[in-house]
């Protein structure tokens, strides 16, 4: 009985702390046409303190969505346009010599912001990608002999073009794993496309104002961490991730030759955190299997290595995840 009372109290706190989520969604929808899943995914990454990678062809509002979200939050924002000639110092900062006092001074890079847009991250070579991804992992940056903590909250929202396009450098598996979510952006519907045309030819570019603060985001994250996950849900999450490593143990022997590696423990942690954030968005103080299923593709799609056989057969990680989710027993 006490547990149910606790859940009711938690639901009340979530209702109180999550009011800004509605305002964020309204603000996003004023600028972004459609793309409901994209907006929801950005909110999940924001609430679960997990970096997000958006993939899609140019022109699908990836950059606009991230920029709009940052404008709706009263916090520091910076944009890094990744190009082949970008240097690590252009991202994290460097030491600059001053002739006036004959000393080196630290010049901090654009990574020192609450929200960092890493635009077209796969346009820059590996050493530049590594500079940003190290900052993502450690939440600190070393310039010269000094180490500087990054601001709180610190969230990297990156975009990339599909790897088939020319002039792109594929992110290594170990680095892309640091993104909690990888969201693939699709084309809008016909009706949405017509609305996009109408808004743009009329010059109807709506400006948004901040509706919340960085402090409110941190308070909401503290509540998200209290969202209850039952042992059966923990087992469900672990089973899904284990099925990517040992599919034959879950009656999916046909997947064994299609997977070179499965999700790591980081995948399990990310799946639990994302499911909690999704429950919070739905104003619930506990996680249900539907929450896990709602986020599993975005959490897992970049954490499964496909074999040559899978690629030759045009089998995607999404198909493998769907088969696993359909097979693993739901609590």
Feature annotation, model-predicted:
Residues 46-83:
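Walker A/P-loop
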Residues 13-60, 242:
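Pre-Walker A (pre-P-loop) alpha-helix and adjacent loop at the N terminus of AAA/AAA+ ATPase modules
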Residues 56, 119-120, 131:
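Walker B catalytic acidic pair
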Residues 57, 91, 159:
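P-loop (Walker A) phosphate-binding loop of NTP-binding proteins
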Residues 98-102, 120, 124, 128, ...:
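Canonical AAA+ ATPase core
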Residues 41-44, 97-117:
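Conserved alpha-helical scaffold flanking the Walker A/P-loop in AAA+ ATPase domains
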Residues 1-8, 14, 247-331:
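C-terminal engagement/docking regions of AAA+ P-loop ATPases
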Residues 13-18, 31, 168, 182-254, ...:
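Conserved C-terminal "switch" segment of AAA+ ATPases
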């Amino acid at each position: 009985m006490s547990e149910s009372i606790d859940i009711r109290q938690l639901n009340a706190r979530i209702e109180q702390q999550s009011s800004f989520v509605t305002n964020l969604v309204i603000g996003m929808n004023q600028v972004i046409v459609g793309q409901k899943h994209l907006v929801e995914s950005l909110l999940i990454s924001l609430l679960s303190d997990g970096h997000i990678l958006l993939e899609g062809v140019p022109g699908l509002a990836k950059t606009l969505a991230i920029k709009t979200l940052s404008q709706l939050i009263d916090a520091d924002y910076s944009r890094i346009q990744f190009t082949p000639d970008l240097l690590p110092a252009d991202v994290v900062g460097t030491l600059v010599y001053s002739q006036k006092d004959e000393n080196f001074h630290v010049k901090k890079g654009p990574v020192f912001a609450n929200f960092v847009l890493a635009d077209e991250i796969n346009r820059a070579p590996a050493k530049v990608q590594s500079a940003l991804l190290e900052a993502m992992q450690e939440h600190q940056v070393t310039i010269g002999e000094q180490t500087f903590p990054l601001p709180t909250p610190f969230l990297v929202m990156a975009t990339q073009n599909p790897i088939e396009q020319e002039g792109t450098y594929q992110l290594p598996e170990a680095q892309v794993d640091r993104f909690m979510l990888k969201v693939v952006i699709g084309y809008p519907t016909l009706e949405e496309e017509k609305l996009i045309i109408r808004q743009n030819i009329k010059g109807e570019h709506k400006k948004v104002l901040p509706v919340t603060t960085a402090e409110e985001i941190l308070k909401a994250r503290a509540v998200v961490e209290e969202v209850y996950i039952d042992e059966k849900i923990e087992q469900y999450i672990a089973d899904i991730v284990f099925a990517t490593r040992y599919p034959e143990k879950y009656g999916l022997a046909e997947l064994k030759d299609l997977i070179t590696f499965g999700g790591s423990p980081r995948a399990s942690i990310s799946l639990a955190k994302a499911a909690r954030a999704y429950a919070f968005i739905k104003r619930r103080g506990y996680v249900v299997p539907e929450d896990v299923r709602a986020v599993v593709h975005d959490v897992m799609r970049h954490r499964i290595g496909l074999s040559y056989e899978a690629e030759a057969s045009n089998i995607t990680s999404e198909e493998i995840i769907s088969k696993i989710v359909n097979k693993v027993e739901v609590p």
